[in-house]
Amino acid sequence: MGTNNDYRLKPSFGDSFGTGWRVMGDNFLRLFLVVLVVGILTGPTKMFHMNFSSSDFPHFPWIWHGHMGHEFFNLASLGLLAGFFILLALLYSFLVVPVIKYGSKMIFIQAVRKIKPDFEWLLKGFWENYLNIILANLLVVALVILGFIALIIPGIIIGCRLAFVSYLVMDKKLDPIEAVEQSWKLTRGHGWTIFFMGFVSIFIVIFGLILMIVGVFPATMWISSSFASLYQAVLNEKEKPAELIAAQA
């Protein structure tokens, strides 16, 4: 972490996106590969958004043509099939995807710290810190949903204040409760910065999609690098060495 000063790490909107751009440029191929792999590994959850009808499976054994009440049995069979796929999607979304996404965030932190990104982080969470990752993700999702139910704005506030949970779980090996509490402390005074960065990120992704879709890869890389830069900048601010604090006094 002694090379952090190579980048302009200040917890502001402009500095975070500016540093994120530099980080992306310095590690383009490696971060591109990370984003590509994450997209492939998290993509299966989108495969389960299907619309079934009995006409799609005319020769399957559960199609009860010619039997009394065959329409009911057809619908029931398709319902069970759809339920099975939905269950698979939920299990994959909550037991696999968070590990991959949390690992990718650690890779972006390494890039910000000028450490050679280690691709093993994409899967390392399955044998290291797995339970903390899964529980932290569930806790954050539950808190944000409760906030949105409470009138939307609380959900946005909670989402912004818990933006560092995934970084803290991977970087500091904190448990879910500690990560939530620490993220809340670290983001104090930076909530608006996180909100505006998230808001602008939406338009960056849209612009990337407009560029023949392929632009979404550098857009995602830039956004991820920028948030990792913000996290590191806030961390540096909160963890200043004692001698530096004494010198500034």
Language-model segments: which ranges?
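Hydrophobic alpha-helical membrane segments
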Residues: M1-A249
